[in-house]
Swiss-Prot record:
Family of the protein in this entry: Belongs to the YajQ family.
NCBIfam families per UniProt: PRK05412.1
Protein name, UniProt field: Nucleotide-binding protein MSMEG_1165
Pfam families linked: DUF520
GO MF annotation list: nucleotide binding
Keywords noted in UniProt: Nucleotide-binding
Matches recorded under InterPro entries: DUF520, UPF0234-like_C, UPF0234_N, YajQ-like_sf
Organism name: Mycolicibacterium smegmatis (strain ATCC 700084 / mc(2)155) (Mycobacterium smegmatis)
Record function comment: Nucleotide-binding protein.
Length: 163
């Protein structure tokens, strides 16, 4: 019998992030507590989002609104990294980045976790920015998925190509 396998990746659907950003922008434009604060949210480059407002409290509230929209669109909070508010003239600015991909240190940490705590006979190989996990038994692969979901890793993981 052939080995079963799946890939562990960290990818974010940019269209879903764009939808969350547009929903947040619409809410910021219509909500009563944001009236007159010149609160904006926009893309700055491919993976950077910038939020601006007239006060520090309003920009923090705008970040919370955006995070709420991300969660509603099934995007993990581990994929969005927001900085502290920075004064910028008469406004405050927060830049946040969308994190994608598994770094080599994170990949080593994940494969070590699978080797140490996962079922016997499970192999994990690093392939670029993804990890291929293979085993003879599908039940072992499901146990590895449960292990990784329960682990406190600082990266949003998705499981794809389950065969």
């Amino acid at each position: 019998m052939a080995d079963s396998s799946f890939d562990v990746v960290s990818k974010v659907d940019r269209q879903e992030v764009d939808n969350a950003l547009n929903q947040a922008a619409k809410e910021l434009a219509t909500r009563f507590d944001f009236r007159g604060t010149d609160t904006t949210i926009a893309w700055k480059g491919d993976e950077v989002i910038e939020l601006t407002s007239s006060t520090e409290e309003r920009v923090k509230a705008a970040v919370d609104v955006f995070k709420e929209k991300l969660v509603r669109r099934d995007i993990s909070m581990k994929a969005f990294d927001a900085e502290d508010p920075q004064p910028s003239g008469k406004t405050y600015k927060v830049t946040g980045t969308i994190k994608q991909g598994i770094t080599s240190e994170q990949a080593k940490k994940i494969t070590k976790l699978i080797r140490d705590e996962g079922p016997k006979g499970v192999k994990a190989q690093i392939q670029g920015d993804e990890i291929r996990v293979s085993s003879k038994k599908r039940d072992d692969l499901q146990a590895v998925i449960a292990l990784l979901k329960g682990a406190d890793l600082d990266v949003a993981l998705q499981f794809v190509n389950y065969r």
